[in-house]
């Protein structure tokens, strides 16, 4: 199970704290989005202050809190990713996570009776404390393009930006560089990061935020316990099934040995024990017995 961070120890690199800071200070949020997009944003409006796909964290661990729009109606979702989550199958989940976010936000934008041409431009921003593609870039920007001609863009107005806090190169502004350094070190280095740090402490002194975090952690623990117990039950069931199968196989081998000693024909042993010819021949060889064909 995941270790729990105390509320007073939360840093900006924690997703809960990051979202609380972005939601509670419009000016900081606007400046950060503008620095990532490398454009001046005059104003932002919070579309949903708590767009939770299922109460708190579901099995995917997804909680969409910071959804906003600028003066041009472009929508943004801000997310802090402190872990590169890998599935049991060994697949990194971040790319599929972006697809899931897009589908949920798009469905939310499409009101009943409206056409799909009402979809506003969407930018999904993931600030990561790890370099997902290991190329050292500050920002990886993705749009849909034609593989046969990369100059052709599928103009679906969806952009995904993976912002790498460990980045070393790329054309980004100083404000973003300093913010990413602050994310990794927790040490403010300019006026902007000092303002962010002050807002972090303001959140820590907010009783409501503390209560929300405690409820969130309780929900996460509950989910982990249920998942653990389900895994235990599945393990017991699997072990029981394997044990029964092994018992039946052992009984078949013992029966085959007795029949081999009585020089019963191979076809009869095969039919009686459901063992293959290869298994019976190998068993006979292991026990120094003769196989009677027929």
Residue ranges and their predicted role:
Residues 1-208, 294:
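Conserved single-residue anchors adjacent to enzymatic active/cofactor-binding motifs
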Residues 2-8, 12, 76-81, 167, ...:
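Short, charged alpha-helical interaction segments and adjacent helix-coil junctions
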């Amino acid at each position: 199970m995941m270790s729990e961070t105390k509320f007073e120890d939360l840093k900006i690199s924690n997703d809960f704290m990051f979202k609380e800071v972005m939601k509670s200070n419009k000016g900081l949020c606007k400046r950060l989005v503008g620095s990532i997009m490398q454009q001046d944003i005059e104003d932002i409006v919070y579309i949903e202050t708590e767009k939770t796909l299922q109460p708190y964290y579901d099995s995917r661990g997804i909680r969409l809190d910071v959804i906003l729009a600028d003066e041009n109606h472009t929508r943004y979702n801000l997310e802090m990713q402190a872990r590169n989550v890998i599935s049991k199958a060994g697949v990194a989940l971040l790319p599929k996570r972006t697809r899931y976010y897009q589908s949920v936000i798009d469905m939310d934008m499409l009101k009943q009776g409206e056409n799909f041409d009402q979809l506003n431009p969407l930018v999904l921003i993931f600030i990561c404390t790890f370099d997902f593609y290991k190329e050292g870039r500050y920002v990886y920007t993705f749009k849909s393009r034609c593989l046969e001609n990369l100059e052709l863009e599928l103009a679906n107005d969806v952009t995904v930006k993976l912002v790498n806090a460990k980045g070393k190169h790329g054309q980004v502004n100083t404000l973003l560089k300093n913010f990413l350094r602050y994310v990794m070190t927790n040490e403010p280095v300019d006026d902007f990061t000092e303002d962010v740090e002050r807002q972090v402490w303001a959140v820590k002194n907010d009783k409501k935020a503390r209560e929300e975090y405690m409820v969130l952690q309780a929900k996460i623990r509950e989910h982990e316990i249920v998942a653990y117990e389900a895994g235990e039950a599945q393990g017991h069931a699997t072990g029981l099934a394997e044990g029964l199968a092994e018992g039946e196989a052992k009984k078949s081998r013992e029966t085959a040995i007795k029949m081999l000693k009585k020089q019963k024909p191979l076809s009869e042993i095969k039919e009686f024990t459901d063992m293959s010819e290869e298994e019976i021949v190998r068993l006979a060889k292991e026990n120094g017995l003769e196989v009677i064909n027929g």
